[in-house]
């Protein structure tokens, strides 16, 4: 998509002069942002023959441990299509934990004790998926990108972007400006690259289209705990030692829906030396968010989690939790334009810059890696911008809608709605199984497709899954109307 001409417009020379900058570094490609999508894009650009590839990131290092961002990724079949293509899967497996045989151990505060359960979304298609901490994945991708010759610049902030006089794009970073004919915006939901493109096209094509979701707006913080620790089995008073490689959920003493009930979630981590965090995800009015000091956090934990000795959470961790700013899940969202041409420069958006959503289906990193794989596949195409737009804009829209419906009540925000959703999920599974026995595969998929969450986790095409869901919804609605009409008659 070529951008329309804009007159008058300041030249890059005017822009640089205004900033007092004079050093211009000409490169073949610039990636803005060194999260998973950006580092993967740097690897892909080098793989596709680009010589001078620069990736810019404001953080000081790729693998900094940040408690507020100490979540884990599940790199599934979709994400592994890219890691397989570049030979990075084994390195990621070496730093992660396989999802094969995944189970979740529940550690209750009462006589229910401790026992393993099978998660609802533990799919056979995700058996080879890999759990890996964010810092570990970033380190693996950064090492690969640097090994391949990408120039990773950490501790560098982007001050602005503008069209250069020669048709390229200038990216101002302090005293240096990178001039490039190819830009990849991997800089998140508040993308500077996307904002730059919005100045050149009608802004509406780059404005996120937000969808309502029961999990949107939920507030979260991370509570640091040791990689392994002892808890009390309230059934018999015995000690139980957790392992870093296993997953746990720790329900609170309060069980009725109220502003004290919550659960701690711990996902598996391979490295026993890496700090571990427990996820706390609750609505904004929950009492835990009112704990303003470490002492108040400690009092809350003692009251609600008698199965956890004080030693599990240090005083420092309690204080850090109290003063940390909470995060909030975004609404599922997407943008309609994911690539454009500025002058002679090609600009592409990947990852959260084109689609963002709550982590309900674990698709953030996988959708981003699929973006990067598609980008690499079309780069040699003379019409790469149009080809990428045609492939990823529909995918971004589809995954946003799928997350909206996939598994939004898993955070215990409404007991009765969660149960109602689970009944519907079981019903869709049963209908799909029955249709598969009675009808040819293609017809069965049209009439009663498997739940959207299952198809997404199994690695099926986002757009195809969304089409099946919409078609089945229309068929179900038509059937319900027909039955109602017949009953009235």
Model-identified regions with their sequence ranges:
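Conserved N-terminal helical subregion
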Residues: 23-27, 76-222, 294
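Conserved Rossmann-like nucleotide-cofactor binding loop
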Residues: 37, 41, 61, 190
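C-terminal helical "tail/cap" subdomain of flavin- and related membrane-associated enzymes
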Residues: 13, 21, 319, 377-489
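N-terminal mitochondrial targeting presequence
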Residues: 1-17
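Glycine-rich FAD pyrophosphate-binding loop
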Residues: 30, 43-68
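FAD/FMN-dependent oxidoreductases across multiple families
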Residues: 270, 284-374, 379-380
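Beta1/beta-strand and adjacent pyrophosphate-binding region of the FAD-binding site
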Residues: 20-37
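Conserved FAD-binding catalytic core of PHBH/FMO-like flavoproteins
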Residues: 170-326
């Amino acid at each position: 998509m070529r951008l329309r001409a804009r007159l008058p417009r300041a030249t890059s020379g005017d822009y640089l002069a205004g900033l007092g900058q004079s050093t211009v570094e000409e490169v073949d490609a610039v990636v803005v942002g060194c999260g998973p999508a950006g580092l993967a894009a740097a690897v892909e650009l080098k793989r596709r023959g680009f010589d001078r590839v620069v990736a810019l990131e404001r953080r000081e290092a790729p693998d900094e441990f940040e408690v507020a961002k100490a979540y884990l990724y599940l790199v599934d079949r979709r994400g592994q299509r890219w890691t397989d293509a570049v030979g990075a899967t084994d390195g990621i497996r070496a730093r992660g934990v396989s999802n094969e045989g995944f189970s979740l151990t529940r550690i209750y505060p009462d006589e229910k004790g401790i026992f393993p359960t099978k998660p609802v979304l533990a799919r056979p298609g995700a058996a080879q998926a890999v759990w890996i901490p964010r810092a570990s994945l970033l380190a693996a991708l950064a090492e690969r990108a640097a090994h391949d010759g990408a120039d990773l610049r950490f501790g560098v902030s982007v001050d602005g972007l503008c069209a250069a006089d020669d048709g390229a794009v200038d990216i101002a970073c302090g005293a240096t400006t990178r001039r490039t004919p190819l830009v990849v915006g991997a800089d998140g939901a508040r993308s500077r690259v996307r904002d730059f493109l919005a100045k050149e096209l009608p802004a509406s094509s780059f404005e996120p289209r937000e969808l309502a979701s029961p999990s949107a707006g939920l507030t979260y913080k991370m509570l640091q705990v040791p990689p392994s620790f002892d808890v009390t089995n309230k059934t018999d008073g015995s000690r139980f030692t957790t392992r870093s490689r296993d997953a746990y959920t720790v329900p609170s003493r309060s069980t009725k829906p109220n502003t004290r009930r919550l659960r701690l979630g711990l996902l598996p981590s391979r490295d026993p030396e890496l700090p571990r965090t427990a996820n706390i995800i609750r609505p904004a009015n929950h009492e835990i968010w009112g704990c303003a000091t470490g002492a108040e956090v400690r009092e809350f934990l003692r009251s609600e989690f008698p199965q956890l000795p004080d030693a599990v959470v240090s005083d420092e961790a309690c204080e850090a939790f109290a003063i940390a700013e909470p995060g909030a899940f975004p609404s599922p969202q997407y943008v309609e334009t994911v690539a454009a041409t500025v002058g002679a420069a090609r600009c592409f958006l990947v990852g959260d810059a084109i689609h963002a959503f709550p982590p309900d289906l674990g698709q953030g990193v996988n959708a981003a890696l699929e973006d990067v794989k598609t980008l690499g596949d079309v780069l040699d195409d003379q019409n790469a911008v149009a080809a990428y737009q045609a492939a990823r804009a529909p995918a971004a829209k589809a995954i946003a809608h799928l997350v909206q419906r996939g598994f939004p009540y898993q955070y215990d925000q409404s007991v009765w709605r969660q149960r109602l959703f689970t009944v519907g999920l079981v019903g869709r599974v049963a209908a799909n199984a029955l249709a598969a026995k009675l009808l040819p595969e293609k017809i069965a998929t049209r009439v009663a497709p498997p739940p959207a969450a299952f198809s997404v986790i199994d690695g099926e095409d986002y757009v195809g899954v969304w089409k099946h869901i919409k078609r089945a919804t229309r068929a179900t609605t038509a059937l319900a109307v027909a039955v109602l009409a017949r009953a009235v008659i």
